[in-house]
UniProtKB/Swiss-Prot annotation:
Heterotetramer of two alpha chains (FadB) and two beta chains (FadA). It catalyses: an acyl-CoA + acetyl-CoA = a 3-oxoacyl-CoA + CoA. GO terms for biological process: fatty acid beta-oxidation; fatty acid catabolic process; phenylacetate catabolic process. GO terms for molecular function: acetyl-CoA C-acyltransferase activity. Its main location: cytoplasm. NCBIfam families: AcCoA-C-Actrans (TIGR01930), fadA (TIGR02445), PRK08947.1 (NF006510). SUPFAM superfamilies: Thiolase-like. The keyword Calcium does not apply. It is found in: Cytoplasm. Belongs to the thiolase-like superfamily. Thiolase family. This is 3-ketoacyl-CoA thiolase FadA.
Amino acid sequence: MEQVVIVDAIRTPMGRSKGGAFRNVRAEDLSAHLMRSLLARNPALEAAALDDIYWGCVQQTLEQGFNIARNAALLAEVPHSVPAVTVNRLCGSSMQALHDAARMIMTGDAQACLVGGVEHMGHVPMSHGVDFHPGLSRNVAKAAGMMGLTAEMLARMHGISREMQDAFAARSHARAWAATQSAAFKNEIIPTGGHDADGVLKQFNYDEVIRPETTVEALATLRPAFDPVNGMVTAGTSSALSDGAAAMLVMSESRAHELGLKPRARVRSMAVVGCDPSIMGYGPVPASKLALKKAGLSASDIGVFEMNEAFAAQILPCIKDLGLIEQIDEKINLNGGAIALGHPLGCSGARISTTLLNLMERKDVQFGLATMCIGLGQGIATVFERV
């Protein structure tokens, strides 16, 4: 079976969804920009030699509809002979795109693929057009489709206090701002055109969503966002609304060597699981355990983790049950996470994987794991091994 390698991984800056840098930039343009950039950065691979493009996106309507993967590829002037498909596993969409491409390569049906994802949550809101079947309440809790309430449930089940949530959220902003100041994101962010507050066109090379002034004291003043009477989860301890895209060049190890391209990491294992929709945020725990089992590893073998921060109330129980609560500052989201950077749904799986690869290189560790929860009760995880 072919070994699957990541040759390159990039992303746009994360733009604020409300009046942010990409308020006048479409999702297809963010995607096409990264497709062009990946090909330009790796000229040994001719675009016509791509076997497929797998692109994650959740809200596939309006500008993100009608197979945005193909629309973006056409905008990027990828040869018409190269196919493209849009993948939807909600929050895990672009990580699923990676898994789909990896399996094609493993079986010999492909040698080189572009994968990634996008979400413009400013142009296409998360709840746009959502219409749950009324009979679904006979099978799952009525609030299972309300992500914030599932996070509240997890926090109560695992003894996660409001103070713990506020502290974790403040850490996310502090870590992300420190990474920005030290240029830790420089290797992954591709400068992308947008508009400043005055409407002037400029190139953005930083994440505008981070709030460096965030403190535990300020977070403590925020009101609960989802359960006003008894809740703990606030806007400050939830993932920010942002716009962005991320992309990876995925190849068979043999083809990469043929072309003289240096792989950055192998895909060691992949896993997707389901869980109770009422605690959808718990999905990373069984997904990570299954991915580790497939890789023949344990959590202690992993040098760094990227765990998507949907909510502080959600990620802390996952960290706790993976036995990592004492290692947060050494291994978990060392450059901050979605609470500070935002969670553009279809983008995030590729985004956290891209950040993980850079952290693995900087920390000089052999193994890394990226994982995320998925709405309505799923989890997805990928173990990477440096080459």
